[in-house]
């Protein structure tokens, strides 16, 4: 696969079309192309079979929805390099294996199944929980902008990854946004403070490096937000005016794939902004080993 394109999964649903909009903007910011894909397990068995010309055939319908999505992306970001492809596999397998590696995969939160959250449960959630590259889930929610400056939120958990911090910093720089590092803990404020210090220090260094390469005067700020209490409540509140929330998935010995945890799961289901899930390892300890 080409690695110079943002990838967006398309199924023709309103949610996936919102994902196309978001992905087109993201590709434009990054100076990348946009690859629009649709997964169809039937295509695996029908490759090489001549199209019968039936305008109602699945193959024709897939071509139509990809064309419509590509046209939408072109109208949103004229001149963006676009490619379309039908992946001959069931969706989860296609998106996890066929697209590896990818700089970024964008998905809608709700597909054609008709039940709220069905696609998120059956495809988006499984892909986000197992992917080794960043996955952004875009919800059908109107984005509220009540802050004077743009905001990217980095949600800290007990196993926060350096990769998630790096991705959040990158997004803040691309969007000319401040980075809000948010952490809530049920108990143990000392450990929570230590984690916050580690992440903020790392993010500040990354932002300083990025700022040295910027040609304009904007400089992103790192804002700390921590509180004792239920993490879900605090994070959902902070997500209201955010352009993006970034969460980290971690590997748990004895389990296959990555672990999202209940808080990250809740963010994917309910956060009123796009949510990026970034795989990675915890920050190294002083000895250089993963904590």
Show where each model-derived region lies.
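Small/aliphatic-rich secondary-structure junction motif
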Residues: 1-52, 150-195, 212-222, 244, ...
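Short, flexible loop segments at boundaries between secondary-structure elements
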Residues: 273-285
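A short acidic, glycine-rich active-site loop
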Residues: 54-64, 196-202
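Structural beta-alpha unit
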Residues: 1-2, 15, 56, 72-105, ...
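Structured core of small recognition/catalytic domains
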Residues: 178-247, 256-263, 267-268, 274
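Glycine-rich, Arg-bearing micro-motifs that act as flexible, cationic patches
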Residues: 107-126, 244-270
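Hydrophobic alpha-helical segments and helix pairs
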Residues: 102-146
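Conserved N-terminal glycine/acidic-rich loop preference
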Residues: 17, 34-36, 59-66, 102-108
């Amino acid at each position: 696969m080409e690695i110079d394109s943002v990838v967006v999964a398309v199924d023709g649903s309103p949610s996936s079309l919102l994902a196309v909009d978001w992905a087109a903007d993201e590709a434009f910011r990054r100076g990348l192309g946009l690859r629009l894909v649709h997964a169809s397990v039937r295509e695996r068995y029908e490759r090489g079979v001549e199209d019968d010309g039936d305008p109602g055939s699945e193959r024709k319908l897939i071509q139509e929805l990809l064309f419509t999505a590509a046209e939408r992306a072109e109208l949103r970001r004229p001149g963006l390099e676009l490619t379309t492809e039908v992946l001959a596999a069931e969706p989860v397998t296609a998106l996890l294996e066929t697209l590896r590696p990818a700089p970024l995969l964008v998905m809608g939160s709700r597909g054609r199944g008709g039940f709220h959250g069905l696609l998120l449960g059956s495809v988006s959630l499984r892909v986000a929980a197992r992917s080794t590259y960043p996955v952004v889930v875009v919800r059908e929610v109107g984005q509220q902008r009540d802050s004077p400056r743009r905001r990217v939120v980095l949600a800290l958990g007990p196993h926060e990854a350096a990769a998630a911090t790096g991705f959040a910093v990158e997004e803040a720089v691309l969007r000319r946004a401040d980075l809000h590092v948010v952490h809530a803990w049920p108990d143990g404020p000392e450990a929570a403070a230590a984690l916050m210090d580690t992440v903020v220090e790392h993010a500040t260094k990354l932002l300083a490096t990025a700022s040295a390469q910027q040609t304009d005067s904007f400089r992103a700020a790192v804002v700390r937000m921590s509180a004792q209490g239920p993490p879900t409540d605090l994070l959902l509140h902070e997500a209201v005016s955010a352009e993006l929330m970034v969460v980290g998935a971690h590997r748990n010995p004895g389990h296959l794939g990555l672990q999202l945890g209940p808080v990250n799961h809740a963010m994917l289901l309910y956060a009123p902004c796009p949510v990026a899930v970034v795989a990675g390892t915890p920050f190294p300890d002083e000895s250089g080993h993963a904590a």
